[in-house]
């Protein structure tokens, strides 16, 4: 399904609106979007997801911008899978940060005829986060649209599913646990960057978005998707690979194939093989070859 991405909105008529940051588009977000999709079906109005074009903390705390589970293209891909019709990227700047919540809602209403708004239980908006579920509900009553506040999604143990918890799991190397909360295996998209690929070696240097949350330093079994083909591989993440303007990781191929420099690839995390042991030089290279053989066994390629 194709998702329409809107960056310069104009009045388009009736819409059901889903509000949120949707980082990672995890199981909690999925619950919210399915509620919004149900309302879209009931009202006949298309579903528009309204989210900011960047995380508010990029503006509010520019020295400490947060790592993200998903870039805008990754987010849009997942939302299309969940059958959203449109995603509107609202520019977030200092002026937006200082906007009163009532004005924010007025701006939304000026762009569409709102049939319903769906938001999460802890969604806040407007100056100092003053906008909340109560204010949304009052605005809906005043202007004649339906409001649904979606309760938190929880694990079987009762833990609230959140983007921050998933980031924490990834930072501890818990790939499989993070996948359970996401509802899918964590993915990273990037570009083949290293000349190693041109030399026919079985190691690819992948360059990724600088804000992308990577799993803890170590090695992981993964799937490497290039176009229409998917192959088992091994991911190696290490702090020494990270320059300032982008993030990098190494992909150890498990067969004799290679990839061209500049090719777009998609890496899907499967499971942790080994956390970093602080090795370097020859010891690290030998250990990585051992890890590669372990990955081959995981994919039954030994």
Describe the predicted segments one by one.
Residues 8-71:
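N-terminal catalytic cores of NTP/NDP-binding nucleotidyl/phosphoryl-transfer enzymes
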Residues 26, 79, 117, 178, ...:
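Residue-level signal for inorganic ion chemistry
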Residues 67-75, 98-105:
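Glycine-rich, highly charged phosphate/nucleotide-binding loops
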Residues 74-88:
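A glycine-rich helix N-cap at a beta->alpha junction
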Residues 90, 94-177:
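Contiguous mid-protein beta-loop-alpha structural module that forms a pocket-lining wall or clamp
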Residues 140-236:
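Glycine-rich, Lys/Arg-enriched anion-binding loops that position phosphate/diphosphate groups
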Residues 193-302:
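Phosphate/ribose-recognition catalytic cores of enzymes acting on nucleotide-derived substrates
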């Amino acid at each position: 399904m194709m998702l329409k991405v809107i960056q310069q909105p104009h009045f388009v008529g009736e819409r059901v609106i889903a509000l949120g940051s949707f980082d990672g588009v995890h199981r909690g977000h999925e619950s919210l979007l399915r509620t919004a999709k149900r309302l879209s079906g009931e009202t006949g109005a298309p579903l528009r997801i309204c989210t900011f074009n960047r995380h508010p903390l990029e503006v509010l705390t520019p020295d400490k911008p947060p790592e993200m589970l998903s870039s805008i293209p990754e987010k849009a891909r997942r939302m299309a899978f969940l059958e959203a019709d449109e995603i509107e990227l609202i520019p977030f700047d200092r002026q937006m940060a200082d906007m009163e919540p009532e004005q924010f809602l007025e701006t939304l209403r000026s762009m569409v005829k709102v049939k319903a708004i769906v938001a999460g239980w802890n969604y806040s908006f407007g100056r100092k986060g003053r906008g909340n579920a109560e204010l949304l509900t009052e605005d809906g009553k005043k202007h004649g649209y339906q409001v649904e506040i979606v309760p938190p999604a929880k694990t079987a143990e009762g833990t609230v599913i959140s983007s921050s918890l998933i980031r924490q799991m990834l930072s501890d190397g818990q790939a499989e646990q993070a996948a359970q909360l996401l509802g899918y295996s964590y993915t990273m998209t990037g570009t083949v960057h290293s000349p190693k690929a041109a030399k026919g070696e079985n190691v690819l240097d992948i360059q990724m978005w600088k804000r992308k949350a990577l799993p803890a330093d170590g090695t992981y079994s993964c799937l490497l998707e290039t176009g229409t083909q998917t192959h088992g591989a091994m991911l190696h993440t290490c702090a020494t690979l990270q320059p300032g303007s982008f993030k990098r990781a190494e992909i150890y191929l498990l067969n004799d194939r290679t990839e061209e420099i500049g090719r777009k690839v998609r890496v899907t995390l499967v499971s942790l093989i080994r956390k970093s042991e602080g090795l370097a030089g020859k010891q690290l290279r030998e250990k990585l070859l051992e890890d590669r053989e372990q990955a081959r066994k995981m994919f039954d390629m030994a």
